[in-house]
Amino acid sequence: MACSRARARAYSSAANLGPGFDALAVALDAYYDEVEVRVCSGGNSVYVDEVEGKFSSGVLQGPNTAAEAVRGLLNMEGVEAEVGIRVYKGVPPGRGLGSSGASAAAAVAAVSHALALEVPVDRLVFYAGLGERAAAGQPHFDNAAASILGGLAVVASDAAGKLRVFRVPFKAWFAVVTPMNPVPQGKTGVMRKVLPENVSFRDAVRNFSRAAGIVAAAVNGDLKSMGALMMSDEIVEPRRRSYVPCYTQVRKAALQAGALGFSLSGAGPSMIALAPSSEAAREIAAAMEESCICCDNPMTVAAEPAPGASVVG
């Protein structure tokens, strides 16, 4: 039985950026996961051998996004193989930083390389997004797209239901604060349940236009406009922020320290602020940490847009 190995890295991400729910996410070089796979021909199973790394203890037993994503890839690419997976967990789970998406992205990138499949990036995003079912109960593609593509990722489905993904390269700086307060099991799914099933036509149009404005501002390097639009969500963030420790205090501190914009990172509890420079990002991160008085052991970091998933071994 012939076997091959590959190891891939994928970075953390911040989804939504305010009004871009399930459509926008930015890869951040704050944290990363690595996944090593051993792929053997002739088998028909996918399993996780080991989860290690700084945040391995936060990974729940049971369905795993990396394994789920690999199963989807093998099934839809028509490949039979036995795949053993080792996950190095460098992205804190359950914190709104795309931890599950990073594992899934690294896994499909590694398997694609090990099998020399040369899977196009849009399909890699699709398979990684399928892996999110293990964490959220349903596929979603924003974090997976950011971790696969890098930079600012935009995801959409066309009239035929085909997933379309786009990478927007841009220069920016972010401050990230991550409260380590306890979160409910299956936090992503729980935080989706607080959202409304229906919204008004007016609110939908306003959010669509603001999300489009974020993309245009990123393309044009207009960080001031991008930051203002990050703070304009009227649908998702207003319903989630009450679940986030010290949201109001941290937001106020970030803006007083010079942040151009502020939003939850995904479903939280992490929060991100857009900064005008790398030095400002560090200063804003310090202010956010100091203000997070109701946060348990908050982690803060200054970050920039990260590259996409890559094979590292």
UniProtKB/Swiss-Prot annotation:
Domain of life of the source: Archaea
Main location: cytoplasm
Pathway: Amino-acid biosynthesis; L-threonine biosynthesis; L-threonine from L-aspartate: step 4/5
Cellular component GO terms, alphabetical: cytoplasm
Cellular location(s): Cytoplasm
GO terms, biological process: threonine biosynthetic process
An example Gene Ontology molecular-function term: homoserine kinase activity
Function: Catalyzes the ATP-dependent phosphorylation of L-homoserine to L-homoserine phosphate.
Record protein name field: Homoserine kinase
Taxonomic lineage: Archaea, Thermoproteota, Thermoprotei, Desulfurococcales, Desulfurococcaceae
